[in-house]
Regions:
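Generic transmembrane alpha-helix motif of multi-pass integral membrane proteins
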Residues: 74-92
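Hydrophobic transmembrane alpha-helices of multi-pass, membrane-embedded glycosylation machinery
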Residues: 76, 95-100
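Interfacial segments of multi-pass membrane proteins
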Residues: 85-86, 99-104
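Signal-transducing coiled-coil linker helices
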Residues: 224-225
């Protein structure tokens, strides 16, 4: 059992590497810009919805079949959609990812639909909490995001136990996937946010450099005048 779980962790990390490479490539485009700030405008919210819905669906596609279910990294897209975009974006990302998962079938399909929606909402509530308290440093913290993803995955396991039937099959499934999915989704969400945070720091550095250069030009202009 331990060897099977270890093998599943390795497999999920292989899929996660592809996932993060795609995220890194996206970070080199202007589309990544809205993800580095608290999203207020609707165009930015729509873009966040599209991007994180894509990652949510991708997390399912990159998943691995385990006993008529799918071990996956879907929670990363749902949680980050809520954290970056807010409750509405989180709900819509979770709904999109959940409907897609339901379409694939399996005895956990309905439970995974509910849990994905709940994960998006959880991220959205965390967003609202930190924005209301003006703690954007925590909102963009990889440690916080990883912790939220961990809680989201534990919540998903609970929903599977409550909803999926037969119950014995649900228990057996969770015994096999809980450790690999907790590790993969927690680290994956933290690494994704680290990427966003690094991009955010780079933009701030460029902004400071541009402001300093503009100030020097203004000073020279004043001397001429």
């Amino acid at each position: 059992m331990a060897f099977e779980q270890f093998a599943l962790v390795i497999s999920l990390f292989q899929q996660l590497c592809v996932y993060l490479v795609i995220a890194w490539l996206l970070s080199k485009t202007p589309l990544f810009m809205p993800l580095t700030q608290v999203t207020l405008s609707w165009p930015h919210k729509i873009l966040c919805y599209l991007i994180f819905s894509g990652f949510c669906v991708m997390g399912t596609y990159f998943g691995l079949r385990v006993e008529d279910s799918i071990a996956n990294t879907r929670a990363i897209g749902a949680v980050l959609g809520g954290i970056v975009g807010g409750p509405v974006v989180g709900l819509l990302v979770g709904l999109t990812g959940g409907i897609h998962r339901y379409s694939l079938g399996g005895f956990t399909a309905l439970a995974c639909t509910f849990s994905t929606i709940a994960e998006g909402l959880l991220g959205g509530l965390v967003h609202r909490h930190f924005v209301a308290r003006h703690r954007l440093d925590l909102l963009f913290s990889p440690w916080v995001v990883g912790s939220v993803a961990l809680i989201a995955e534990l919540m998903q396991m609970g929903i599977i136990l409550l909803v999926a039937r037969p119950y014995d099959d649900a228990v057996h499934l969770i015994e096999n996937i809980i450790a690999p999915m907790l590790v993969a989704n927690t680290l994956g969400a933290a690494m994704f946010m680290r990427m966003i945070l690094d991009h955010r720091a780079m933009l701030e550095k460029y902004s400071v450099a541009f402001s300093a250069r503009a100030l020097k030009i203004a000073e020279r202009a004043m001397r001429v005048l």
